[in-house]
Curated annotation (Swiss-Prot):
SUPFAM superfamilies: NAD(P)-linked oxidoreductase. NADP(+) binds at S205, P206, I207, G208, R209, G210, L211, F212, A213, G214. It comes from Rauvolfia serpentina (Serpentine wood). CDD domains: AKR_AKR13D1 (cd19145). It holds the Pfam family Aldo_ket_red. The gene is PR. This is Perakine reductase. Changing Y57A: 99% loss of activity. Substrate binds at H126. It catalyses: raucaffrinoline + NADP(+) = perakine + NADPH + H(+). The active site is at Y57. Aldo-keto reductase involved in the biosynthesis of monoterpenoid indole alkaloids. Broad substrate specificity enzyme with a high selectivity in the group of alkaloids. Can use perakine, 19(S),20(R)-dihydro-peraksine-17,21-al, cinnamic aldehyde, p-coumaric aldehyde and 3-(3,4,5-trimethoxyphenyl)propanal as substrates, but not ketosteroids such as progesterone. NADPH could not be replaced by NADH. Belongs to the aldo/keto reductase family. Optimum temperature is 50 degrees Celsius.
């Protein structure tokens, strides 16, 4: 497993991370605790040391608690824990973010307790509170770094202006953002800005919310999956998007790998500073994901793969309408007065 630097502040992680969200049932049924811990331990055995969670995953922070229990069976000092705060409310009416200093601190304390750790390696603002100047939120995070409660600061779904202003208060180590073969809207402005500032990029949903795994193509999704209402997985949109999958499937045969491995390898090849965090509940899928690291792609290969997924042919928005307003395009904050 290759190791890379995220950001310029010294954080070193495995080139492939692991997203823990799905273990607590945010996509399908939650795994029994022992099975969830077994998946995390096997990820570590495969060389993955960078684990991603959030205070909003599972019920009442249960995903952080699960990771915390797994950490008790692993060498803590060899693991980089990334967790997130800032989603204050989530429901049918949408998502409300909160970035006030007292909320920042209380979330950090609660995450430390649930994870049962002395420090958090990477603490992200999960979604941007557009009512609070980002300098205010970052100021409190800077204090938490100085106190040793967190080591590095990250942003998620932040706009270019917010990234610049946050980074001016305290160095931002990583930006977590959706990035995959069929969601590439960060390439024009966000990626160059992160590189200019020395901020690592952590793509979530790097295999297209599972599209390139093929389950939604070859069989019907489980009724309880959140994807059954996702714009890209319903009705005519899914029928159109199946063609994208079939093109990647054909290219994967040429490269002697699975469609998932090709889609993930494409993301991994976007730069040393790009560390995707795919998640899964199954050991065999975990091994399949790790296998993407063996797929070597040339510049010509990367272009051919990109061209097989013309963005104007992708049917449906990348996120549910109710949470679209929390996307990076709407994540500016008021000026500091």
């Amino acid at each position: 497993m290759p190791r890379v630097k995220l950001g310029t502040q010294g954080l070193e992680v495995s080139k492939l991370g692991f997203g823990c969200m799905g273990l607590s049932g945010d996509y399908n049924d939650a795994l029994p605790e022992e099975q969830g811990i077994a998946v995390i331990k096997e990820a570590f055995n495969c060389g993955i040391t960078f684990f991603d969670t959030s205070d909003i995953y599972g019920e009442n922070g249960s995903n952080e608690e699960l990771l915390g229990k797994a950490l008790k069976q692993l060498p803590r000092e060899k693991i980089q824990v990334g967790t997130k705060f800032g989603i204050h409310e989530i429901g049918f009416s949408g998502v409300k973010a909160k970035g006030t200093p007292d909320y920042v601190r209380s979330c950090c304390e609660a995450s430390l307790k649930r994870l049962d750790v002395d420090y958090i390696d990477l603490f992200y603002i999960h979604r941007i509170d557009t009512t609070v100047p980002i300098e205010i939120t970052m100021g409190e995070l800077k204090k938490l770094v100085e106190e040793g409660k967190i080591k590095y600061v990250g942003l998620s779904e932040a706009s270019p202006d917010t990234i610049r202003r946050a980074h001016a208060v305290h160095p931002v180590t990583a930006l977590q953002i959706e990035y995959s073969l069929w969601t590439r809207d960060i390439e024009d402005e966000i990626v160059p800005l992160c590189r200019q500032l020395g901020i690592g990029i952590v793509p979530y949903s790097p295999i297209g919310r599972g599209l390139f795994a093929g389950k939604a193509i070859k069989e019907s999704l489980p009724e309880n999956s959140v994807l059954t209402s996702h714009p890209r997985f319903v009705g005519e949109n899914l029928e159109k998007n199946k063609q994208i999958y079939y093109r990647i499937e054909a290219l994967s045969q040429k490269h002697g790998c699975t469609p998932v491995q090709l889609a993930l390898a494409w993301v991994l090849h976007q730069g040393e500073d790009v560390v995707p965090i795919p998640g899964t509940t199954k050991i065999k899928n975990l091994h399949n994901n790790v296998g993407a690291l063996k797929v070597k792609l040339t510049k010509e290969d990367l272009k051919e793969i990109s061209d097989a997924v013309p963005l104007d042919e992708v049917a449906g928005e990348s996120i549910h309408e109710v949470i679209a307003v929390t996307n990076w395009k709407f994540a500016n904050t008021p000026p500091l007065k």
